[in-house]
Amino acid sequence: MSTSHCRFYENKYPEIDDIVMVNVQQIAEMGAYVKLLEYDNIEGMILLSELSRRRIRSIQKLIRVGKNDVAVVLRVDKEKGYIDLSKRRVSSEDIIKCEEKYQKSKTVHSILRYCAEKFQIPLEELYKTIAWPLSRKFGHAYEAFKLSIIDETVWEGIEPPSKDVLDELKNYISKRLTPQAVKIRADVEVSCFSYEGIDAIKDALKSAEDMSTEQMQVKVKLVAAPLYVLTTQALDKQKGIEQLESAIEKITEVITKYGGVCNITMPPKAVTATEDAELQALLESKELDNRSDSEDDEDESDDE
Protein backbone atom coordinates (compact mmCIF):
# COMPACT_ATOMS: atom_id res chain seq x y z
CA MET A 1 0.00 0.00 0.00
CA SER A 2 1.16 3.52 -0.80
CA THR A 3 2.69 5.95 1.69
CA SER A 4 1.63 8.94 -0.43
CA HIS A 5 -1.74 8.11 -2.05
CA CYS A 6 -5.13 7.64 -0.42
CA ARG A 7 -8.61 9.12 -0.71
CA PHE A 8 -9.32 11.92 1.76
CA TYR A 9 -12.60 10.56 3.08
CA GLU A 10 -13.84 7.29 4.54
CA ASN A 11 -16.33 6.58 1.73
CA LYS A 12 -14.60 5.13 -1.30
CA TYR A 13 -17.01 6.98 -3.61
CA PRO A 14 -18.86 10.28 -3.19
CA GLU A 15 -22.62 10.29 -2.68
CA ILE A 16 -25.15 11.80 -5.08
CA ASP A 17 -25.38 15.61 -4.58
CA ASP A 18 -21.93 15.77 -2.96
CA ILE A 19 -19.87 18.79 -4.04
CA VAL A 20 -16.39 17.67 -5.11
CA MET A 21 -13.12 19.13 -6.38
CA VAL A 22 -12.05 17.79 -9.77
CA ASN A 23 -9.15 18.26 -12.14
CA VAL A 24 -9.90 18.35 -15.86
CA GLN A 25 -7.96 15.68 -17.76
CA GLN A 26 -9.41 15.66 -21.27
CA ILE A 27 -12.15 17.35 -23.28
CA ALA A 28 -14.07 15.06 -25.65
CA GLU A 29 -17.23 15.26 -27.78
CA MET A 30 -19.45 14.00 -24.96
CA GLY A 31 -17.95 16.25 -22.30
CA ALA A 32 -14.95 16.52 -20.01
CA TYR A 33 -13.11 13.66 -18.35
CA VAL A 34 -12.00 14.62 -14.84
CA LYS A 35 -10.27 13.16 -11.80
CA LEU A 36 -11.87 13.50 -8.37
CA LEU A 37 -8.97 14.88 -6.33
CA GLU A 38 -10.45 14.02 -2.93
CA TYR A 39 -11.10 10.40 -3.93
CA ASP A 40 -7.59 9.36 -4.95
CA ASN A 41 -8.05 10.59 -8.51
CA ILE A 42 -10.86 8.23 -9.55
CA GLU A 43 -12.30 9.17 -12.93
CA GLY A 44 -15.54 11.00 -13.57
CA MET A 45 -17.22 12.80 -16.44
CA ILE A 46 -18.97 16.14 -16.81
CA LEU A 47 -21.37 15.73 -19.73
CA LEU A 48 -21.49 18.53 -22.28
CA SER A 49 -25.07 19.38 -21.27
CA GLU A 50 -23.92 19.78 -17.65
CA LEU A 51 -21.15 22.28 -18.31
CA SER A 52 -23.24 25.46 -18.39
CA ARG A 53 -26.80 26.77 -18.07
CA ARG A 54 -26.17 28.96 -21.12
CA ARG A 55 -25.72 27.98 -24.73
CA ILE A 56 -22.18 26.70 -25.18
CA ARG A 57 -20.22 28.59 -27.82
CA SER A 58 -16.74 27.67 -26.67
CA ILE A 59 -16.01 24.76 -24.34
CA GLN A 60 -12.51 26.16 -23.75
CA LYS A 61 -14.01 29.22 -22.07
CA LEU A 62 -16.01 27.04 -19.69
CA ILE A 63 -13.47 24.40 -18.78
CA ARG A 64 -9.74 23.92 -19.38
CA VAL A 65 -7.49 20.87 -19.24
CA GLY A 66 -5.30 20.91 -16.14
CA LYS A 67 -7.57 23.29 -14.23
CA ASN A 68 -9.26 22.44 -10.93
CA ASP A 69 -13.03 22.89 -10.88
CA VAL A 70 -15.93 22.31 -8.51
CA ALA A 71 -18.67 19.89 -9.56
CA VAL A 72 -21.73 18.20 -8.08
CA VAL A 73 -22.23 14.43 -8.25
CA LEU A 74 -25.24 13.35 -10.35
CA ARG A 75 -24.80 9.56 -10.60
CA VAL A 76 -22.48 6.95 -9.11
CA ASP A 77 -22.11 3.42 -10.43
CA LYS A 78 -19.90 1.82 -7.79
CA GLU A 79 -19.69 -1.51 -9.62
CA LYS A 80 -18.42 -0.03 -12.88
CA GLY A 81 -16.73 2.95 -11.22
CA TYR A 82 -18.65 5.51 -13.32
CA ILE A 83 -19.30 8.93 -11.85
CA ASP A 84 -21.33 11.58 -13.69
CA LEU A 85 -20.95 15.16 -12.58
CA SER A 86 -22.35 18.60 -13.28
CA LYS A 87 -20.70 21.99 -13.33
CA ARG A 88 -23.77 24.03 -14.22
CA ARG A 89 -25.68 23.00 -11.07
CA VAL A 90 -22.97 24.31 -8.74
CA SER A 91 -23.78 27.58 -6.93
CA SER A 92 -21.25 30.21 -5.87
CA GLU A 93 -21.85 29.17 -2.24
CA ASP A 94 -21.07 25.56 -3.17
CA ILE A 95 -17.76 26.66 -4.70
CA ILE A 96 -16.71 28.55 -1.56
CA LYS A 97 -17.60 25.65 0.74
CA CYS A 98 -15.93 23.07 -1.48
CA GLU A 99 -12.71 25.06 -1.81
CA GLU A 100 -12.57 25.58 1.96
CA LYS A 101 -13.14 21.87 2.65
CA TYR A 102 -10.62 20.87 -0.02
CA GLN A 103 -7.90 23.09 1.45
CA LYS A 104 -8.50 21.63 4.92
CA SER A 105 -8.43 18.09 3.53
CA LYS A 106 -5.21 18.80 1.61
CA THR A 107 -3.57 20.03 4.81
CA VAL A 108 -4.60 16.90 6.71
CA HIS A 109 -3.38 14.74 3.81
CA SER A 110 -0.02 16.51 3.77
CA ILE A 111 0.46 16.04 7.53
CA LEU A 112 -0.47 12.35 7.41
CA ARG A 113 1.68 11.73 4.34
CA TYR A 114 4.69 13.22 6.13
CA CYS A 115 4.27 10.69 8.96
CA ALA A 116 3.51 7.81 6.58
CA GLU A 117 6.71 8.43 4.61
CA LYS A 118 8.81 8.98 7.73
CA PHE A 119 7.71 5.72 9.37
CA GLN A 120 7.08 3.82 6.11
CA ILE A 121 3.46 3.14 7.04
CA PRO A 122 0.67 2.87 4.45
CA LEU A 123 -1.07 6.24 4.30
CA GLU A 124 -4.48 4.57 4.37
CA GLU A 125 -3.61 3.03 7.75
CA LEU A 126 -3.12 6.51 9.22
CA TYR A 127 -6.42 7.62 7.74
CA LYS A 128 -8.19 4.56 9.19
CA THR A 129 -6.66 4.85 12.67
CA ILE A 130 -6.44 8.65 13.03
CA ALA A 131 -8.04 10.97 10.47
CA TRP A 132 -11.34 9.22 9.77
CA PRO A 133 -12.16 8.53 13.44
CA LEU A 134 -11.42 12.20 14.21
CA SER A 135 -13.60 13.32 11.30
CA ARG A 136 -16.50 11.27 12.65
CA LYS A 137 -16.08 12.93 16.04
CA PHE A 138 -15.21 16.53 15.09
CA GLY A 139 -16.71 16.93 11.62
CA HIS A 140 -13.28 17.19 9.98
CA ALA A 141 -9.83 15.96 11.03
CA TYR A 142 -8.45 19.45 10.34
CA GLU A 143 -10.60 20.92 13.14
CA ALA A 144 -9.44 18.14 15.46
CA PHE A 145 -5.78 18.73 14.56
CA LYS A 146 -6.08 22.46 15.31
CA LEU A 147 -7.87 21.84 18.60
CA SER A 148 -5.27 19.26 19.65
CA ILE A 149 -2.63 22.01 19.90
CA ILE A 150 -4.37 23.31 23.04
CA ASP A 151 -6.43 20.28 24.07
CA GLU A 152 -4.77 16.87 24.42
CA THR A 153 -8.12 15.15 25.05
CA VAL A 154 -8.67 15.24 21.28
CA TRP A 155 -6.53 12.10 21.07
CA GLU A 156 -8.62 10.10 23.54
CA GLY A 157 -9.94 6.95 21.90
CA ILE A 158 -7.51 7.22 18.97
CA GLU A 159 -5.34 4.13 18.42
CA PRO A 160 -2.38 5.07 16.19
CA PRO A 161 0.04 2.47 14.77
CA SER A 162 2.54 3.38 17.52
CA LYS A 163 3.28 5.98 20.19
CA ASP A 164 6.22 7.25 18.12
CA VAL A 165 3.90 7.94 15.20
CA LEU A 166 1.47 9.86 17.41
CA ASP A 167 4.27 11.88 19.05
CA GLU A 168 5.69 12.83 15.64
CA LEU A 169 2.20 13.67 14.39
CA LYS A 170 1.55 15.97 17.37
CA ASN A 171 4.90 17.70 16.86
CA TYR A 172 4.29 18.23 13.14
CA ILE A 173 0.73 19.48 13.70
CA SER A 174 2.07 22.02 16.18
CA LYS A 175 4.59 23.28 13.61
CA ARG A 176 2.11 23.40 10.73
CA LEU A 177 -1.08 24.65 12.38
CA THR A 178 -0.08 26.90 15.29
CA PRO A 179 -1.52 30.31 14.30
CA GLN A 180 0.97 33.04 13.38
CA ALA A 181 0.35 36.57 14.60
CA VAL A 182 -0.62 39.11 11.95
CA LYS A 183 0.75 42.65 12.16
CA ILE A 184 -1.91 45.37 11.87
CA ARG A 185 -1.04 48.99 11.12
CA ALA A 186 -2.82 52.33 10.85
CA ASP A 187 -1.49 55.85 10.12
CA VAL A 188 -2.99 58.97 11.69
CA GLU A 189 -2.22 62.67 11.76
CA VAL A 190 -2.75 64.19 15.21
CA SER A 191 -2.45 67.93 15.74
CA CYS A 192 -3.49 70.47 18.34
CA PHE A 193 -2.61 74.19 18.29
CA SER A 194 -4.08 75.15 21.64
CA TYR A 195 -2.00 76.24 24.63
CA GLU A 196 -1.84 72.62 25.84
CA GLY A 197 -1.06 71.30 22.35
CA ILE A 198 1.97 69.09 23.09
CA ASP A 199 0.50 67.65 26.28
CA ALA A 200 -2.83 67.13 24.53
CA ILE A 201 -1.19 65.06 21.80
CA LYS A 202 0.74 63.03 24.39
CA ASP A 203 -2.47 62.34 26.33
CA ALA A 204 -4.32 61.32 23.17
CA LEU A 205 -1.59 58.93 22.04
CA LYS A 206 -1.22 57.48 25.53
CA SER A 207 -4.97 56.82 25.60
CA ALA A 208 -4.50 54.69 22.48
CA GLU A 209 -1.70 52.66 24.05
CA ASP A 210 -3.86 52.22 27.15
CA MET A 211 -6.27 50.26 24.93
CA SER A 212 -3.71 47.43 24.94
CA THR A 213 -4.75 44.01 26.19
CA GLU A 214 -2.65 41.07 27.27
CA GLN A 215 -3.15 39.49 23.85
CA MET A 216 -2.83 42.66 21.73
CA GLN A 217 -0.43 45.48 22.56
CA VAL A 218 -1.12 48.82 20.87
CA LYS A 219 2.03 50.79 20.06
CA VAL A 220 2.26 54.36 18.76
CA LYS A 221 5.36 55.66 16.95
CA LEU A 222 6.13 59.13 15.62
CA VAL A 223 7.09 59.21 11.94
CA ALA A 224 7.26 62.98 11.46
CA ALA A 225 4.83 65.34 13.17
CA PRO A 226 1.89 65.27 12.79
CA LEU A 227 2.10 61.70 11.38
CA TYR A 228 1.96 58.75 13.78
CA VAL A 229 1.84 55.00 13.19
CA LEU A 230 -0.28 52.66 15.30
CA THR A 231 0.58 48.95 15.31
CA THR A 232 -0.56 45.77 17.00
CA GLN A 233 -0.18 42.04 16.48
CA ALA A 234 -3.11 39.63 16.57
CA LEU A 235 -3.82 35.98 15.84
CA ASP A 236 -7.19 37.07 14.45
CA LYS A 237 -6.77 39.74 11.76
CA GLN A 238 -10.27 41.16 12.17
CA LYS A 239 -9.89 41.52 15.94
CA GLY A 240 -6.58 43.32 15.42
CA ILE A 241 -8.21 45.75 12.98
CA GLU A 242 -11.06 46.37 15.44
CA GLN A 243 -8.52 46.98 18.21
CA LEU A 244 -6.78 49.73 16.23
CA GLU A 245 -10.13 51.22 15.17
CA SER A 246 -11.03 51.52 18.86
CA ALA A 247 -7.62 53.06 19.60
CA ILE A 248 -8.12 55.68 16.87
CA GLU A 249 -11.59 56.48 18.22
CA LYS A 250 -10.00 57.04 21.63
CA ILE A 251 -7.34 59.36 20.17
CA THR A 252 -10.08 61.35 18.41
CA GLU A 253 -12.15 61.55 21.58
CA VAL A 254 -9.26 62.85 23.72
CA ILE A 255 -7.70 65.26 21.21
CA THR A 256 -11.11 66.76 20.37
CA LYS A 257 -11.55 67.77 24.02
CA TYR A 258 -8.41 69.87 23.68
CA GLY A 259 -9.58 71.43 20.43
CA GLY A 260 -7.30 69.28 18.27
CA VAL A 261 -7.98 66.90 15.38
CA CYS A 262 -7.14 63.34 14.38
CA ASN A 263 -7.19 62.45 10.68
CA ILE A 264 -6.82 58.87 9.47
CA THR A 265 -4.36 58.73 6.57
CA MET A 266 -4.34 54.91 6.39
CA PRO A 267 -7.13 52.88 8.01
CA PRO A 268 -6.13 49.77 10.00
CA LYS A 269 -5.02 46.90 7.77
CA ALA A 270 -2.82 43.81 7.86
CA VAL A 271 0.67 44.54 6.58
CA THR A 272 3.15 42.26 4.86
CA ALA A 273 6.65 41.56 6.15
CA THR A 274 8.01 43.83 3.39
CA GLU A 275 5.74 46.73 4.39
CA ASP A 276 6.70 46.25 8.03
CA ALA A 277 10.41 46.25 7.16
CA GLU A 278 9.96 49.46 5.16
CA LEU A 279 8.23 51.08 8.15
CA GLN A 280 11.03 50.04 10.52
CA ALA A 281 13.62 51.44 8.11
CA LEU A 282 11.68 54.73 7.91
CA LEU A 283 11.41 55.00 11.71
CA GLU A 284 15.14 54.29 12.12
CA SER A 285 15.95 56.89 9.47
CA LYS A 286 13.82 59.51 11.26
CA GLU A 287 15.45 58.62 14.57
CA LEU A 288 18.91 59.15 13.05
CA ASP A 289 17.78 62.50 11.60
CA ASN A 290 16.51 63.58 15.01
CA ARG A 291 19.78 62.59 16.67
CA SER A 292 21.74 64.48 14.02
CA ASP A 293 19.60 67.60 14.54
CA SER A 294 20.07 67.33 18.29
CA GLU A 295 23.86 67.03 17.95
CA ASP A 296 23.93 70.05 15.59
CA ASP A 297 22.03 72.10 18.18
CA GLU A 298 24.52 71.09 20.88
CA ASP A 299 27.46 72.07 18.64
CA GLU A 300 25.92 75.48 18.00
CA SER A 301 25.40 76.12 21.71
CA ASP A 302 29.04 75.11 22.40
CA ASP A 303 30.26 77.57 19.77
CA GLU A 304 28.36 80.36 21.46
UniProtKB/Swiss-Prot annotation:
GO BP terms: formation of translation preinitiation complex; translational initiation
Chief location category: cytoplasm
Entry-annotated residues carrying Phosphoserine: 52, 292, 294
Subcellular location(s) per record: Cytoplasm, Cytosol
Keywords (A to Z) from UniProt: Cytoplasm, Initiation factor, Phosphoprotein, Protein biosynthesis, RNA-binding
Biased composition (Acidic residues): 294-304
Domain S1 motif, first and last residues per copy: 17-88
Effect of residue 205 to E: Abolishes binding to the eIF2 complex alpha subunit GCD11
PTM annotation, UniProt: Phosphorylated; phosphorylation on Ser-52 by the GCN2 protein kinase occurs in response to low amino acid, carbon, or purine availability. Phosphorylation inhibits the guanine nucleotide exchange factor activity of the eIF2B complex.
Pfam families, sorted: EIF_2_alpha, S1
UniProt region (Disordered), positions on chain: 283-304
GO-annotated cellular components: cytoplasm; cytoplasmic stress granule; cytosol; eukaryotic 48S preinitiation complex; eukaryotic translation initiation factor 2 complex; multi-eIF complex; ribosome
Skewed-composition ranges (Basic and acidic residues): 284-293
Alphabetized InterPro entries for the sequence: NA-bd_OB-fold, S1_domain, S1_IF2_alpha, TIF2_asu_C, TIF2_asu_middle_sf, TIF_2_asu
Family note: Belongs to the eIF-2-alpha family.
Subunit architecture: Eukaryotic translation initiation factor 2 eIF2 is a heterotrimeric complex composed of an alpha, a beta and a gamma subunit. The factors eIF-1, eIF-2, eIF-3, TIF5/eIF-5 and methionyl-tRNAi form a multifactor complex (MFC) that may bind to the 40S ribosome. Interacts with CDC123; the interaction is direct. Interacts with GCD1.
Other facts noted in the record for this chain: Present with 17100 molecules/cell in log phase SD medium.
Known function: eIF-2 functions in the early steps of protein synthesis by forming a ternary complex with GTP and initiator tRNA. This complex binds to a 40S ribosomal subunit, followed by mRNA binding to form a 43S pre-initiation complex. Junction of the 60S ribosomal subunit to form the 80S initiation complex is preceded by hydrolysis of the GTP bound to eIF-2 and release of an eIF-2-GDP binary complex. In order for eIF-2 to recycle and catalyze another round of initiation, the GDP bound to eIF-2 must exchange with GTP by way of a reaction catalyzed by eIF2B.
Name under which the protein is recorded: Eukaryotic translation initiation factor 2 subunit alpha
Organism, as annotated: Saccharomyces cerevisiae (strain ATCC 204508 / S288c) (Baker's yeast)
